[in-house]
Amino acid sequence: MAGCKPTTGLNILLITEYARSVQAFAVESVENIMRLDWKQVHAAETAVSGRYITSIACLDEKTDTNELAMVLDVEQILYDITPANHDLHATNLQTTKFHIKPGAVAIVAEDSKVARSMLEKGLQAMEIPAQLHITGKDAWEKIGVLAAQAQAEGVPITDKIALVLTDLEMPEMDGFTLTRKIKTDPLLKDIPVVIHSSLSGNANEDHIRKVKADGYVAKFELNELSSVIEEVLDRSMKKIDGPLISRKQLA
């Protein structure tokens, strides 16, 4: 197996499903399986030099031990292995006109550096102005600032925020929590929210429906993302309520 030099003689493969594909990671051993709250995970771009680390997880709350684990940027790994399969093909974008008010921006929450870069290029190709954030918490704080500005000016929040585009798994605040906070706030609930995640499958889509997101696209396909954003913004402009918009509904 390329790049692997096992020292234990054990051939253990950790099978994952990510970004519409199945992968096998060679590991020497499995020490423990833990469930963590995303509040225990912190962004690490400025603290860790490795390009394959996206965040650091605190495995316990004991200050004397304070065990830490580095979280892999799987999207970066997949992009390096098969870049053609995990790129946003902006050159092949089907051009369209998006219903965005002048001055409004897209708020993007994405912890993976490579995914964030691809989203930035994709939104530029769509001519959608965007502000990018590493965590859901950062995005939520920016939404609060823009909401305060909208209130002070006496204008709808959609004059400031055209849509929110968020990943699901992020440090400090995940995409489910971010979406739920937006959709349960009377002042923010009209902001269209599109989930753009490497996690796929019916279970995740059910969770996305429960938090009342407006759209869902599995990474990475720019035309699908563009189509979902177009439909979500069109429905928002016409003030039409409807079911979750995903590539299944648009197919």
Regions inferred by a protein language model and the residue ranges of each:
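Acidic catalytic/metal-coordinating carboxylates
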Residues: T135-D138, D174-T177
